[in-house]
Curated annotation (Swiss-Prot):
Protein name: 3-hydroxyacyl-[acyl-carrier-protein] dehydratase FabZ
Gene name per UniProt: fabZ
Signal peptide boundaries: none
Location, primary (coarse class): cytoplasm
Key words of the record: Cytoplasm, Lipid A biosynthesis, Lipid biosynthesis, Lipid metabolism, Lyase
Xref: InterPro entries: FabA_FabZ, FabZ, HotDog_dom_sf
Originating species: Vibrio cholerae serotype O1 (strain ATCC 39315 / El Tor Inaba N16961)
Catalytic activity, reaction form: a (3R)-hydroxyacyl-[ACP] = a (2E)-enoyl-[ACP] + H2O
Residues the record marks as active site: 57
GO MF, one annotated term: (3R)-hydroxyacyl-[acyl-carrier-protein] dehydratase activity
Domain of life: Bacteria
Location in the cell: Cytoplasm
The keyword Magnesium is assigned to this record: no
Length: 153
């Protein structure tokens, strides 16, 4: 799958917020632990019981919603797109375009640390294709193929 570099490039929350428009409670990447432009990005999401989705999903047995795992993958692809293709023009954004072959293998619960790994596959006419895998303690909890598109708004 991914070949990791020995010299790690990272991003803290300040740099992530400078690239993504999302904010709490919808900013789902807390830190980037490694990336290489045009190749891969590894992001981290600390799952806390204090997050608002746990009041209703599910009060007796809190489970991090699968759709939010996919959103974390989409945000990671956006970060990798910025690092690979540069910042969009003032009237452009990277949009989440599609998801295919999403599979959920294990539940994610409060206290888990979600590692989101995305790999750039190809780009054509402003649409980029990525593979995504989310892991907890090294075990795959979700995988999918994602596309993001650079478009004017």
């Amino acid at each position: 799958m991914m070949t990791l570099t020995t010299d790690k490039k990272t991003m803290n929350i300040t740099e992530i917020q400078s690239l993504l428009p999302h904010r709490y409670p919808f900013l789902l990447i807390d830190r980037v632990t490694d990336y290489e432009e045009g190749k891969y990005l590894i992001g981290l999401k600390n799952v806390s019981v204090n997050e608002p989705q746990f009041t209703g999903h599910f009060p007796q047995l809190p489970v991090f919603p699968g759709v939010l795992i996919l959103e974390a993958m989409a945000q990671a692809t956006g970060l990798l797109a910025f690092k690979t293709f540069g910042a969009p023009k003032e009237n452009e954004l990277y949009y989440f375009a599609s998801i295919d072959e999403a599979k959920f293998r294990k539940p994610v619960t409060p206290g888990d640390q979600l590692m989101v790994e995305v790999e750039f596959l190809k780009e054509r006419r402003g649409i980029a294709l990525f593979n995504g895998v989310a892991k907890v303690d090294g075990d795959v909890v979700c995988s999918a193929q994602l596309k993001c598109a650079r478009r004017e708004f």
